[in-house]
Swiss-Prot record:
This is Frizzled-3. The gene is fz3. Disulfide bonds join C40-C101, C48-C94, C85-C123, C112-C153, C116-C141. It is found in: Membrane. Keywords: Developmental protein, Disulfide bond, G-protein coupled receptor, Glycoprotein, Membrane, Receptor, Signal, Transducer, Transmembrane, Transmembrane helix, Wnt signaling pathway. A motif (PDZ-binding) lies at residues 579-581. The lineage of its organism: Eukaryota, Metazoa, Ecdysozoa, Arthropoda, Hexapoda. It comes from Drosophila melanogaster. It comes from the Eukaryota. Receptor for Wnt proteins. Most of frizzled receptors are coupled to the beta-catenin canonical signaling pathway, which leads to the activation of disheveled proteins, inhibition of GSK-3 kinase, nuclear accumulation of beta-catenin and activation of Wnt target genes. A second signaling pathway involving PKC and calcium fluxes has been seen for some family members, but it is not yet clear if it represents a distinct pathway or if it can be integrated in the canonical pathway, as PKC seems to be required for Wnt-mediated inactivation of GSK-3 kinase. Glycans are attached at N54, N206. Residues 259-270, 343-359, 415-442, 510-581 are cytoplasmic. Belongs to the G-protein coupled receptor Fz/Smo family. Residues 20-237, 292-321, 381-393, 464-488 are extracellular.
Length: 581
């Protein structure tokens, strides 16, 4: 019944009295405007469009002389309108700021006194006291026109007020020349439908009818539908703090890599790109928290976008999803390459130069395939906005590939660790034996510190519960707000994701790094490269303590190449002439 959802504008005329003397009018009259000099203009503010008329004239009851001032005022009244205290609240507030204007009427037409008193009484009864403080001071019901006094005004007949927000009577008008415009109640009370053909859909508070399924209700944009405001504040604080720490530590690691690139050759070079991925990953989170919130407040103040019945996918949201998903998979790919390089160095005796020759292949494998999952999610239309974090998500499209990459990396990590232990056991207690043990401990510790939190974050993401909609209500009494979802899975996911990224910067944390920065900052004597110091220290030791080329170094007495690839912070623990590759 399309006619059941029509908004009725009742214009009461004082034909002889007002036309003769224009006395007794308390409505908004354009200053200096005569009966034939009224300047009508289209209503340009989206929040007050669809009232049943589309032309207005200024100044209004608040004294605004342009629509921008009125738009800023209506944006401040959004919480009161969206509270659902009265289904007529939107019409009353908008008509007070954008009165009706038509060439057939000599002055702008405001709402009637009875309508104002009805809406104010309903809101006083249903709205919280803090929301009633938003009631505009310029909207004095006693000063509005009254039909009983033959004053021109707009009134919604009381007999159309039926449960469900659907008027029961046919559209009527009390004035000539004013057309009947059908209008749903979707902006009048919380939970109305977003489209005119769904006007009969009843939804809980902070929900609106789905334009795709008339039996479902979707969350309204920027409202507390599935999560409370405290949950959102907690997640925002957590993301902001961890992202800042992750950005600083990974940036420090990147600067260290850049300052001394010769210290970090293969097989440890993939850590550089692992840090780069998480540095950019933290930047994405920081951008969404800092700039997105500012843009959201700007939209509320200037455009009233909170009046939208539902949250749609926006280009910034999609961009954040593609970027974070891509960087997550790139990081998992570089973790796999990192473990693979150590495996090839320790088990297959690949040299650093051999791994360097295949760096191009590593880059292709790490940067190109991760594009597929987020693009597939977009093509399959599986991306949804997240109410809790304000970012977009597509469950399973990133988590499952990342989990596979992490498990493959764990396999090569275990194989590499076993090979390192076997090689270490072949050495007698010498300087090389001690340094080799340090390499293995550092490799295993770093792998554990990265794999554990990152895998925990992926598992938490798989366990996270998402909700897109709720069933529509059959009667107003059944429209109860759903129980808020738990925010713990999302908070755990965010925590472990950013902690895992932060710990990637630990690879450069060593005494050599401290000495290098101290020398560069001129804190001790003449600045000297730590690389030169290491070379001098290595030259002062006998070669038999640095290379494993003699029979006395092996328990079996055989001459075997022990290690061909790892040069941990320039500790020379292998003989390049013994490389098989």
């Amino acid at each position: 019944m399309y006619a059941a959802s029509i908004l009725i504008l009742h214009l009461t005329w004082a034909v002889a009295t007002i036309a003769a003397n224009g006395a007794g009018h308390n409505g908004p009259v354009a200053s200096g405007a005569g009966p034939n000099g009224l300047q009508c203009q289209p209503i340009a503010v989206s929040a007050c469009q669809g009232l049943g008329y589309n032309m207005t004239a200024l100044p209004n009851l608040a004294g605004h002389t342009n629509q921008l001032e009125a738009e800023l005022q209506i944006a401040k009244l959004v919480p009161l309108i969206e509270s659902g205290c009265s289904r007529r609240a939107r019409f009353l507030l908008c008509s007070s700021l954008f009165p009706l204007c038509t060439p057939d009427v000599p002055r702008p037409v405001a709402a009637c006194k009875l309508l104002c008193e009805t809406v104010r009484g309903e809101c006083m009864e249903n709205a919280p006291p803090e929301l009633m403080e938003l009631w505009p001071s310029f909207l004095n019901c006693d000063g509005l026109p009254q039909p009983e006094k033959h004053e021109l005004c707009m009134q919604i007949p009381q007999e159309v007020a039926v449960p469900g927000g659907s008027p029961s009577g046919p559209p009527t008008t009390g004035s000539p020349g004013v057309e009947d415009h059908p209008q749903t109640y979707r902006f009048w009370k919380s939970g109305a439908s977003p489209t005119s053909d769904l006007a009969g859909v009843l939804c809980p508070q902070n929900f609106s009818g789905s334009p795709f399924n008339p039996e479902e209700c979707v969350p309204q944009c920027q409202r507390d539908a599935f999560h409370t405001s405290s949950q959102k504040k907690t997640s925002e604080t957590l993301i902001l703090g961890l992202s800042a720490v992750c950005f600083v530590l990974t940036l420090f690691a990147l600067v260290t890599f850049w300052a001394e690139p010769t210290r970090f050759g293969y097989p440890e070079r993939p850590v550089l790109f692992l840090c780069l991925c998480y540095n950019l990953f933290s930047v994405c989170y920081l951008e969404r928290i800092v700039f997105h919130n500012q843009a959201r407040m700007h939209d509320v103040e200037l455009q009233g976008r909170l009046m939208r019945p539902g949250c749609l996918l926006t280009p910034p949201c999609l961009a954040s999803y593609i970027t974070t998903s891509y960087l997550s998979l790139c990081a998992a790919s570089w973790w796999l390459i990192f473990a693979l390089c150590f495996y090839l160095s320790s088990h297959k005796k690949w040299s650093s130069e051999a791994l360097e020759k295949r760096s191009g292949l590593f880059h292709v494998l790490a940067w190109v395939p991760p594009l597929a999952p987020p693009i597939a999610a977009l093509l399959l239309e599986k991306v949804r906005p997240s109410e809790l974090t304000g970012m977009c998500y597509a469950p399973g499209f990133v988590e499952l590939p990342a989990l596979v990459l992490l498990l493959l990396g764990l396999y090569f990590t275990l194989r590499a660790s076993r090979s390192l232990l076997s090689l270490q056991q072949q050495l007698q207690p010498t300087l090389a034996h001690h340094r080799f043990g340090q390499i293995r401990k550092r490799f295993v510790l770093f792998s554990l510190l990265y794999f554990a939190p990152t895998t925990a974050g992926v598992v938490a993401a798989l366990c996270e519960r998402y909700a897109d909609s709720v069933p529509s209500c059959s009667t107003p009494d059944d429209c109860l707000s759903p129980t808020p979802l738990s925010a713990w899975p999302a908070l755990v996911r965010i925590f472990f994701q950013l902690v895992g990224g932060t710990l990637t910067g630990l690879w450069v944390w060593s005494r050599k790094t401290c000495e290098s920065y101290r020398n560069r900052l001129g804190a001790s004597g003449t600045p000297t490269s730590s690389l030169m110091n290491q070379s001098k220290a290595a030259g002062a030791l006998p070669k038999k303590h640095l290379y494993t080329s003699g029979k006395s170094m092996l328990p079996t007495g055989g001459i075997t190449p022990l290690y061909a690839g790892i040069s941990f912070h320039n500790v020379p623990v292998y003989n390049p002439n013994q490389s098989r590759v």
